[in-house]
């Protein structure tokens, strides 16, 4: 799985406003770290990296056309990008309760003759919530329903930005706020998580 993540950051000593500032800063920093070489900056040192020959340790891949996100919950900020599958790789399993939410979301969208988001279940939002639920419930057994997820994630806020420039469907510049896809919008609402817009 190609993705980029950073270590959790304890912000419990900060005011709520400072915590949200850290949420935004961590997201933008992750987008910059995870971005492939900037095509508009010939001096970007990432141009020297041979992506085909470089082995990236897990969670440090360079990406473009992706999403970086951070989750603020109980005084901790965690950051993660969306994920893409490499040859011979599998996507990580989402926490069972969150996987169930995404299955419900897909059924709901298809029942209305729609299509799930392009990154359904692979977006930064899905990985962030799953990672947090796994920290709270490592065995995947005590948080098992939508109500359990809502209780566990009470007060959580999420912020997401574009990695690299996006041309379609809506033009977005690198580092610009990126709203959740149609699948994640519904999933975050079901989980009781607020999408912070900055």
Regions found by a protein language model. Give the residues of each.
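Zinc-dependent deaminase catalytic domain
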Residues: 1-198
